[in-house]
């Protein structure tokens, strides 16, 4: 075991526009090279596009998208006697949300098109409607866990 003291988790302050911690977490994950103002502009513009297209509260659509993408189980590699098993594990809520945000942003970046604003908006709308690449990733993760259910007794 490491003797190093574990860093304290600092609370994420809510964002100033929607007063949501989830939005703030997304801005921080969207940010590249310390350009937080650019990341926040991209997300807020994407939320405006969502409002125009769906005629719904953009925060509600965003939260639904994140909830739909959040995985419940994942597999972790565990070595037992020279063999590596993919052991299904339940995902803690904070890790699940972090994975969901990471996947939404990653698959937004991979979408074809020019502006990140429209790509992010489209991915969020798709995720809220339970379609899109981020949802496929979650389904794939759940399938992997289901396929390796036999190794569940190796949990640690």
UniProtKB/Swiss-Prot annotation:
GO biological process: translation
GO cellular component: small ribosomal subunit
UniProt cross-references to Gene3D superfamilies, sorted A to Z: Ribosomal protein S7 domain
Signal peptide interval: none
Database matches in SUPFAM superfamilies: Ribosomal protein S7 (SSF47973)
Keyword tRNA-binding: yes
GO molecular function: rRNA binding; structural constituent of ribosome; tRNA binding
A Pfam entry, by short name: Ribosomal_S7
Superkingdom per UniProt: Bacteria
Keyword Translocase recorded: no
Keyword field: Ribonucleoprotein, Ribosomal protein, RNA-binding, rRNA-binding, tRNA-binding
Function text: One of the primary rRNA binding proteins, it binds directly to 16S rRNA where it nucleates assembly of the head domain of the 30S subunit. Is located at the subunit interface close to the decoding center, probably blocks exit of the E-site tRNA.
Subunit structure: Part of the 30S ribosomal subunit. Contacts proteins S9 and S11.
PANTHER family: RIBOSOMAL PROTEIN S7
Family to which this protein belongs: Belongs to the universal ribosomal protein uS7 family.
Protein's recorded name: Small ribosomal subunit protein uS7
């Amino acid at each position: 075991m490491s003797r190093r003291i574990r860093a304290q988790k600092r609370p994420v302050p809510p964002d100033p526009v929607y007063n949501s911690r989830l939005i703030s977490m997304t801005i921080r994950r969207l940010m590249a090279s310390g350009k937080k103002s650019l990341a926040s502009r991209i997300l807020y513009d994407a939320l405006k596009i969502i409002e125009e297209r769906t005629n719904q509260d953009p925060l509600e659509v965003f939260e639904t998208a994140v909830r739909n993408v959040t995985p419940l189980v994942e597999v972790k590699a565990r070595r037992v006697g020279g063999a590596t098993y993919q052991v299904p594990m339940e995902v803690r809520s904070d890790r699940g949300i972090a994975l969901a945000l990471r996947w939404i942003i990653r698959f937004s970046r991979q979408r074809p098109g020019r502006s990140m604003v429209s790509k992010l908006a489209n991915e969020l709308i798709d995720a809220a409607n339970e379609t899109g690449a981020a949802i496929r990733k979650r389904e794939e993760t759940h399938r992997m866990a289901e396929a390796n259910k036999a190794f569940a007794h190796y949990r640690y």
